[in-house]
């Protein structure tokens, strides 16, 4: 007897907009998808900003999209999680951060706040630094010093003065905190073991040695006169009465407030590792806190926001209930339907089979917009005929990968290819009396023109994505959904109760 499979097709980068210019989705000849929209229930889902745990107005991406779909709940990204905890007030009770506070109190020592002084939101956010300064004030810590790393990459190249003045005004108003050093991120945030760069930053922060200035702005302006933009500002020590304002010493507390790990590891190791061979330096006895987990092998470190383990993701829960599942995609999106869909877990669940179709070897995908969608489809049809699987997760990479090239005609061809493949799969699923859900993880190829400049746009969008429900017994769908609502919908079709960890809600009315 044939199983009634529940098949989720993720058309990567297939968003929806009413705009016609630069819209490869609406321009493509796609009889199958058009027919599905006429004949079957469909709705739109939020796939960007707060709907997927990102800051408001931030475009979605494939990692975040698959994480949210697979988790069946909004998965807050580090930036949003920390910002939310400040506004909710939990931040001020954070155990790791309060260890730094208690140590400074107990030893009458200094609290040092290190990180990228920027609203860029890629590695850090200036608002998180303000949260730390506020915490120090609330807990009555008197000696608070900022070691400010200057950005110039995720924000304009010479914009640091604005952020220095912003934080200095904030510290004056709140009544605690001073900037002790400034360093361009080129030195402070290396990630390629260029220890000679890191050492210059270390020397300023720990030894009080480097370029000298009477204020942070003075140090910055000197750098500008030497034609060095923010990123390349030489590590500089701010003096008070001819001496460094502050340097990291034994028994001090350090909080590194970058949330993205890759460029925060090296300086952390240089300051805090007991055994270190990057350059010669003394070992310090510190209370050292990192905003997120920079590396699981770091010792003597407290983590303020440790990684969350997502229990009962869709794949794990279906597996626990004895069901069989298949994940299938070509190379470009294989990690997304496996690792990210499973909440950042590499190991397959029990009863989870995986099929990887190699992506074509071309320089850019506009040269082969069909990619290997036909091979993915053929392989899936074969597997469906085995009548083994209760659930299938499939990704077509074309609308996203070809959308990124900015070549409109190629993106159109990509959509047409996917339409052909969707048609074949839907027919097979209906033949087996199964259900096909068709959606996307984020937008891209529906908006290939930057409307403000008229130039090609290669980025993702903040547009909603479709959700189509194809079966011999389709029911009505509600409006106002988001990606996290897909897993509960699929579970309903599989007659499985939703686990308590899933906070998404079924889209079926």
Swiss-Prot record:
The cofactor note from the UniProt entry for this protein is: Binds 2 manganese ions per subunit.
Question: Could you say which residues bind substrate here?
Answer: 123, 153-154, 185, 191, 260-263, 333
Part of which pathway? Carbohydrate degradation; glycolysis; pyruvate from D-glyceraldehyde 3-phosphate: step 3/5
- Gene Ontology annotations for the cellular component aspect, listed alphabetically: cytosol
Its Gene Ontology molecular function terms?
A: manganese ion binding; phosphoglycerate mutase activity
Q: Please list the residues that bind Mn(2+) 1.
A: 400, 404, 460
Q: What is its EC number?
A: 5.4.2.12
Q: Where does Mn(2+) 2 bind?
A: 12, 62, 441-442
Where in the sequence is the active site?
A: 62
GO BP terms: namely: glucose catabolic process; glycolytic process
Alphabetized UniProt keyword annotations: Glycolysis, Isomerase, Manganese, Metal-binding
InterPro entries according to UniProt: Alkaline_phosphatase_core_sf, BPG-indep_PGM_N, Metalloenzyme, PGAM_B_sf, Pgm_bpd_ind
Needed cofactors, names only, are: Mn(2+)
Enzyme class, first EC level, given as a word: isomerase
Lineage, top-rank taxon, reads Bacteria
Catalytic reactions of this protein: (2R)-2-phosphoglycerate = (2R)-3-phosphoglycerate
Partners and quaternary state? Monomer.
What role is this protein assigned?
Answer: Catalyzes the interconversion of 2-phosphoglycerate and 3-phosphoglycerate.
Identify its protein family.
Belongs to the BPG-independent phosphoglycerate mutase family.
Query: What protein does this entry describe?
Result: 2,3-bisphosphoglycerate-independent phosphoglycerate mutase
């Amino acid at each position: 007897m044939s199983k009634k499979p529940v098949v989720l097709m993720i058309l990567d980068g297939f968003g929806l907009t009413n705009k016609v210019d630069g819209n490869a989705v609406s321009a493509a000849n796609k009889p199958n998808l058009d027919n599905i929209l006429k004949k079957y229930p469909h709705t739109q889902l939020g796939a960007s900003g707060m709907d997927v745990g990102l800051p408001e107005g931030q475009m979605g991406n494939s990692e975040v999209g698959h994480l949210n779909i697979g988790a069946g709940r909004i998965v807050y990204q580090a930036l949003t999680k920390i910002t939310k905890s400040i506004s909710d007030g939990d931040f001020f009770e954070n155990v790791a951060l309060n260890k730094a506070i208690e140590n400074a109190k107990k030893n009458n020592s200094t609290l040092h706040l290190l990180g990228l002084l920027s609203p860029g939101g890629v590695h850090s956010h200036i608002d998180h630094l303000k949260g730390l300064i506020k915490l120090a004030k609330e807990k009555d810590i008197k000696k608070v010093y900022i070691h400010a790393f200057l950005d110039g990459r995720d924000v304009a190249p010479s914009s640091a003065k604005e952020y220095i003045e912003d934080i200095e005004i904030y510290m004056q108003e709140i009544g605690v905190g001073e900037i002790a050093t400034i360093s361009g991120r080129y030195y402070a945030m290396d990630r390629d073991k260029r220890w000679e760069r890191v050492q210059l930053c270390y020397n300023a922060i720990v030894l009080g040695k480097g370029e000298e200035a009477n204020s942070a702005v003075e140090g910055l302006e000197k750098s500008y006169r030497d034609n060095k933009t923010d990123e390349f500002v030489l590590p500089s020590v701010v003096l008070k009465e001819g001496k460094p304002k502050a340097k990291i010493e034994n028994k001090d507390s350090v909080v590194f407030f970058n949330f993205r790990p890759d460029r925060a590891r090296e300086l952390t190791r240089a300051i805090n590792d007991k055994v270190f061979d990057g350059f010669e330096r003394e070992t310090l006895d510190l209370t050292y806190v990192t905003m997120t987990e920079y590396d699981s092998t770091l010792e003597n470190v407290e983590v303020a926001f440790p990684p969350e383990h997502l229990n009962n993701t869709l794949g794990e829960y279906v597996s626990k209930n004895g069901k069989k599942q298949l994940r299938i995609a070509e190379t470009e999106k294989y990690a997304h339907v496996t690792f990210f869909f499973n909440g950042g877990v590499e190991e397959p669940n029990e009863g989870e089979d995986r099929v990887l179709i190699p992506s074509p070897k071309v320089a850019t995908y506009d040269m082969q917009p069909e990619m290997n969608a036909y091979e993915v489809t053929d392989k899936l049809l074969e597997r469906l005929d085995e009548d083994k699987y209760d659930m299938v997760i499939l990704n077509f990479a074309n609308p996203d990968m070809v959308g990124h090239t900015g070549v409109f005609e190629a993106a159109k061809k990509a959509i047409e290819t996917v339409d052909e493949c969707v048609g074949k799969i839907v027919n097979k699923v209906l033949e087996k009396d199964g259900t096909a859900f068709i959606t996307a993880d984020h937008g891209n190829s529906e908006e290939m023109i930057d409307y403000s400049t008229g130039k090609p746009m290669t980025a993702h969008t903040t547009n909603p994505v479709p959700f189509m429900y194809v079966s011999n017994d389709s029911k009505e769908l509600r409006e106002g959904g988001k990606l996290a609502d897909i897993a509960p919908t699929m579970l309903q079709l599989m007659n499985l109760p939703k686990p308590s960890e899933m906070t998404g809600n079924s889209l079926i009315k």
